[in-house]
């Protein structure tokens, strides 16, 4: 009888140990609290590829700003990019086009298992409600500094 109790106790400990380990391996995908930024005004035109921008240093920020600054508007020669503390933050951006009636939702999640930040933008087009005047946006978002070992991905989906 004592042997059976010991055997059942060991089985219980093994089951608890295994079930606890499974919980630790599940993907944790918290949504971050982020700051969405407006586009940087008429003096900066970011002609972006589908890959998006991941800006994590002031030198890269200034370089990209310089490459995308236009000079054909009044006062653009003296305008500067907003100040961002890249020791604490990373700036993400990807270009989308929407009309004034489209619905847009954005979020940034962290997948701790694959070590990846994912910036998701969902667009629902309501073509029948609006003229087709397109508003182009870079969807800038400021997030806490992305750790070195993490990657960043962008997911943009559009539905009618």
Where are these regions (language model features)?
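Exposed, flexible binding/inhibitory loops of compact, secreted disulfide-stabilized domains
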Residues: 20-160
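Bacterial Sec-dependent N-terminal signal peptides
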Residues: 1-28
């Amino acid at each position: 009888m004592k042997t059976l109790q010991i055997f059942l106790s060991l089985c219980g400990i093994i089951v608890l140990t295994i079930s606890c380990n499974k919980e630790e391996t599940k993907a944790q995908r918290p949504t971050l609290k982020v700051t969405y930024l407006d586009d940087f005004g008429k003096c900066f035109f970011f002609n972006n590829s589908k890959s998006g921008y991941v800006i994590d240093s002031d030198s890269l920020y200034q370089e990209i700003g310089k490459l995308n600054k236009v000079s054909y508007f009044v006062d653009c020669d003296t305008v500067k990019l907003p100040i961002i503390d890249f020791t604490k933050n990373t700036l993400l951006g990807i270009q989308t086009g929407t009309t004034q009636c489209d619905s847009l939702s954005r979020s940034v999640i962290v997948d701790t298992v694959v070590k990846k930040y994912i910036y998701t933008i969902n667009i629902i087009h309501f073509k029948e409600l609006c003229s087709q005047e397109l508003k182009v946006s870079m969807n800038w978002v400021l997030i806490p500094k992305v750790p070195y070992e993490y990657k960043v991905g962008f997911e943009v989906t559009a539905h009618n």
